[in-house]
Amino acid sequence: ETQLSRFEDMEGLYREWNSKINVVSRKDIDNLYEHHVLHSLGIALYLKFRRPDVLRMWGGESLLGGCEVFGDETLTENAVGDGVSCTVLDLGCGGGFPGIPLATLFPEVKFTLCDSIGKKVTVAREVAAALGLENVETVNSRAETLPGAFDYVVSRAVTSLDKFLPWVKGKWHRDIFYLKGGDLVEEIALAMGKFRLPKGSVGVWPISSVLHDEFFAEKMVIDIRK
């Protein structure tokens, strides 16, 4: 399957699995591409416009020129470079977001999708398998007991930053890309003080700078660098 056909297949797969195991609300399943898929790809947009160094590490050089997924003119079946060997942990993946859309866009990056709730991991695993995503592994585990470490961590609003950071202590080498909404000034200040994060190590990027729909008005990508 090409990238585009995989994205097209996602809605049907999630509707099917959601009828068996409710992991997405009715409102969100009716707006799956905007509320889940495109929101997940906000991380890829951030890399494209603010962190091309990481985008290249993930093998996404061709996304710098455009990609139909983002409504640009260039369709790439595999937006990857040579020798990509990055590992990414999606912690608290739920039914597979942001991990599955990102794994679709970056097929040579190894994604580990982890959640403590077994039924959510089942949905993520079955959807990834149906899409033929060979770069996805799913794990039913709490973060604290997950073995190993990863180059990057991604996650979507599973908790406040001051609670999230202890979960991933010792589990990442380069960056955390965290999708979160609302006014984040106090939350970030609390986390920076509590964990003595260096000044300049935390950045915030509004997805609405590229995606202008009202849904993204207060949606941000938080980048925490080592």
Residue ranges and their predicted role:
Residues 174-186:
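Conserved beta-strand signature within the Rossmann-like core of class I S-adenosyl-L-methionine
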Residues 54, 85-94:
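Conserved class I S-adenosyl-L-methionine
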Residues 110-115:
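Conserved SAM-binding motif I beta-strand of class I
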Residues 165-176:
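A short glycine-rich, Lys/Arg-flanked "PGG" loop and its adjoining helix->strand segment in the class I
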Residues 132-143:
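Conserved SAM-binding strand-loop segment of SAM-dependent methyltransferases
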Residues 183-226:
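Active-site capping/gating segments
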Residues 95-108:
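Conserved SAM-binding loop of SAM-dependent methyltransferases across substrates and taxa
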Residues 2-51, 57, 61-63, 67-68, ...:
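Class I SAM-dependent transferase core
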